[in-house]
Design a protein with these regions (language model features):
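A short helix-loop-beta-strand connector motif used in the catalytic cores of GNAT acetyltransferases and
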Residues: 41-57
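Conserved GNAT-fold acetyl-CoA-binding loop/helix
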Residues: 21-42
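Conserved acyl-CoA
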Residues: 102-118
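Conserved beta-strand in the GNAT
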Residues: 57, 63-72
Length: 155
């Protein structure tokens, strides 16, 4: 069952994010307090019925299997509103593709309901996992694949 993440779901979300971070050994610089602040702000905005924020969870037997955190921005090329997936975190001990699709289906309905048409999802996963994730979205939602580069300037 997909449901909106509420004030009382925060601890479950934090546990799943921490589990995902530990299991995947992401190579980005992590600042938990910044991410938690972003999450809490997004939940507050969603609680105000701000359609530019969406935080949803996929629950099976009242257990969080995955969550999606997204907010929108206005594209500087064409002034279109784009829903930007910030996090799609899945419990890797479960059916990943099934949960991803359920979360994205809900997001697509949310975008349509509020008059939107565009979305995007970047990934910080390792190359192989990023490609699988992107190809799933391409297959299911006819998404275009783009490439990006992330770098660090040395001292």
């Amino acid at each position: 069952m997909i449901k909106l993440i509420s004030d009382n779901d925060v601890f479950e979300v934090l546990k799943l994010m921490n589990k995902s971070t530990e299991q995947n050994n992401y190579s980005f610089e992590r600042n938990e307090s910044k991410w938690i602040s972003f999450l809490l702000n997004a939940i507050q905005e969603q609680n105000k019925n701000n359609p530019h924020y969406l935080i949803i969870g996929d629950y099976i037997d009242n257990k969080l299997k995955g969550f999606l955190l997204a907010n929108s921005f206005v594209g500087h090329y064409n002034n279109n509103v784009i829903m930007d997936v910030k996090d799609c975190i899945i419990d890797i001990d479960n059916q990943n593709a099934y949960t991803v699709i359920r979360l994205y289906n809900y997001m697509m309905d949310h975008i349509r309901k509020h008059g939107g048409k565009r979305w995007r999802a970047d990934s910080i996963r390792a190359h192989e996992d990023t490609l699988k994730y992107a190809k799933l979205l391409q297959l299911k939602y006819n998404a275009d694949l783009y490439y990006s580069a992330h770098g660090t300037i040395g001292e």
